[in-house]
Each structure stands twice: as structure tokens, then as C-alpha cells.
Amino acid sequence: MESNRDEAERCVRIGKAAIEAGDKEKARRFFSKAERLYPSSEARVLLDALEKNDTAGNGPQSEKMSKSTEQPKAEKDSSGDTGKGHTQDQVDGVQRIKKCKTYYEVLGVSPDAGEEDLKKAYRKLALKFHPDKNHAPGATEAFKKIGNAYAVLSNPEKRKQYDLTGSEDNVQNNHRNGGFDYHRGFEADITPEDLFNMFFGGGFPSGSVHTFSNGRTRYSHHQHHHHSGHDREEERADGGFSMFIQLMPIIVLILVSLLSQLMVSNPPYSLYPRSGQTIKRVTENLQISYYVSKDFKSEYNGMLLQKLEKNIEEDYVANVRNNCWRERQQKQDLLHAAKVYRDERLRMKAESISMENCKELNRLTSLFRGG
């Protein structure tokens, strides 16, 4: 579909931008998504190139560089949390999330918890640990982990796969400096902030906007003005209008198709009898048989009839000529094969072709010449 193609192109653009930003994991994810939506050579080439570069760069030196770039980034994030006031309860809550070994422990639910239990637990924890409300050290990472836990457990396929491992530590034991690790193989398809907005219809009124993606994309933080209820109504209206604009080409195509079907009428004749056209007639010049409806005489007579019969004869001659060409081609192919393989059966089969259309074409040609 065209919409899939547009979305795939958008994913390719995002992937290219991620490469320029040095985020290969994000680039790989979006190139793969583009391939799933609308396979293209561009996405495939970019993905293959990325895989080759990763294979070539997975040595000790690249691992050392990766650790050196992650450490300042972690320090930067943690400094952002500690720059604001927080309570001891918030610190204790972050430590609890940090010590959790399974996503069920993170959300505080049992392994057989249903969808409603997961939603209820997520709502409570997301509001409590959102970075706009909780400024304790590590609150941002705790919020990420809560979002990732809900996104995985609320997805039946991901949850089933996760349950097979028992805990996060069984997937990959690579904690770094005692912090959270999100490269575990169980990652959400949606960012924690987007998930939060889906539940609560946006962030906190006075807050800042946080963008996360389980370690695969960068963490960004910027202030924005609170949207009033009127602004949200305008955004919904704009969204509806945008959807209408996107659907407009499809609506136009449907209307054009319907109009064309209404405007196109059936031909007044047929070379073979069919429903509604069963009355046999013969053209005056070449004696070609054709079939018409019962009200044909009232609509076609005089010059109009002569013009129509001329068209009928032209259609018939063109049809006979094409069929004659096919008969000749078939016979020549069989004779050639019989000669190459010295097969008498092929020669006899070629000779048995009646060439009826070619005979009819010769008859019509003699009529044209007045023979």
C-alpha cells in the first residue's frame, strides 16, 4: 500500500539521521521496520552496510570506545536528576525499582496478572516516577524500566518469550557500574514517554518533555508551554483534517472509478452470442455474423448502421489476422523442433494444424480484392 511505502521512507530517513548521530541501534531498528513495511533496495543496502560495519567494529577497541561514551552520558543524566529537590520516599522507591530482577517485580504484580492489573499498576507507578514529578537520582531510569516492563508484559508474544527466561538476568548479565541495563532482548516497540502519553493524554501541565527509547535512542529534555483544553481541541480538529487530506486521493479514485463504470455503456454488438445480445445479423459487405439486442433496429439504421458494420468488420478481420499469426507461429515452431530432434511425431502434429483462421483470412482478402 502507498501508506506503507510513505511510512517506510520515513523510517529510512530516521535511520539515516540516527547513523549521523552515531546511534547504530536506532538506525538498524528503523531500517528493519522499513523493510517490513515496504521492502526496498535502499533500506536493504543500508541495513546490510550497517551489519557489516558492526561486524568489523566489534573488537576490543570499539567496546572500549562504547564504554567511554556511555559513562559521560550516564553522568549527565544522573546530574539532571540530582539538580532538583526530592524526598527520601522517592529515593527509596527508585532503589526498589533498581533492585527488581523481573518485570513482574517492577510493576508489583503476580506472574498471572491480567491486562487490567497491569494497567492499574502501570498508571500508579508511572505517575509516581515520571521525571517531571520525581527528581530523585535514578528516577529517569526507573521510569524507563517501568515503561519497558509494562510494554513487554502487555504484549502477549513478548510476555510469552519473556516468561521462558524467568528473569532479566537470564537474558543478558551485563550490568554496567551498578546501573540499569536495557539491552536485554526484551525491549518495547514504544518509548516510555509515548506510552505515558497514551495513558494520560500528555505530560504534566508544568513539566518538561522527556524522550526515551530503552537505551537505543538518546535522552532529550526540553521545556514546553502547557496546552490548554482549547489547544487540544484544535489539535484534534487538525488531526481529523489531516486524516481527511490523506484519504482524499483514495476517495477521488473511488469516485472516478464509479463514474467511469456508470458512463461506459456496453457495445451495441458482439461477435458471439451472449446475454442480452442473441439476435443474429450479418454485415452487408463481408458477410460477418454478429449479435445484437432486440432494440437494435430502432437505434441503428442508415449511415449509422453502415458505420457500425464497418467497425464490426474491422474488429473481426483484426481478430482473424491475430489468430492466423498464432497458427503459423505454432506450426513453424513444431516443424523446426521436428527437424532439430528428427521427431516424426512433431512433424505430423504440425501438419495436422487446420489453419482455419488463415483460411478465413485468405477468404476475406479475396473479398477485398473483389474475387
UniProtKB/Swiss-Prot annotation:
Residues 218-229 have a biased composition (Basic residues). Residues 260-371 are lumenal. Acts as a co-chaperone with HSPA8/Hsc70; required to promote protein folding and trafficking, prevent aggregation of client proteins, and promote unfolded proteins to endoplasmic reticulum-associated degradation (ERAD) pathway. Acts by determining hspa8/Hsc70's ATPase and polypeptide-binding activities. Can also act independently of hspa8/Hsc70: together with dnajb12, acts as a chaperone that promotes maturation of potassium channels by stabilizing nascent channel subunits and assembling them into tetramers. The lineage of its organism: Eukaryota, Metazoa, Chordata, Craniata, Vertebrata. Its main location: endoplasmic reticulum. The chain crosses the membrane at residues 239-259. Residues 102-166 form the J domain. Keywords: Chaperone, Endoplasmic reticulum, Membrane, TPR repeat, Transmembrane, Transmembrane helix. The keyword Endoplasmic reticulum applies. Residues 48-92, 215-235 are annotated as: Disordered. InterPro entries: DnaJ_domain, DnaJ_domain_CS, DnaJ_subfamily_B/C, DUF1977_DnaJ-like, J_dom_sf, TPR_rpt. PROSITE patterns: DNAJ_1 (PS00636), DNAJ_2 (PS50076), TPR (PS50005), TPR_REGION (PS50293). One of its GO terms (molecular function) is Hsp70 protein binding. This is DnaJ homolog subfamily B member 14. Belongs to the DnaJ family. DNAJB12/DNAJB14 subfamily. Residues 64-89 have a biased composition (Basic and acidic residues). It is found in: Endoplasmic reticulum membrane. Residues 1-238 are cytoplasmic. It is a single-pass membrane protein. One of its GO terms (cellular component) is endoplasmic reticulum membrane. SMART domains: DnaJ. It comes from the Eukaryota.
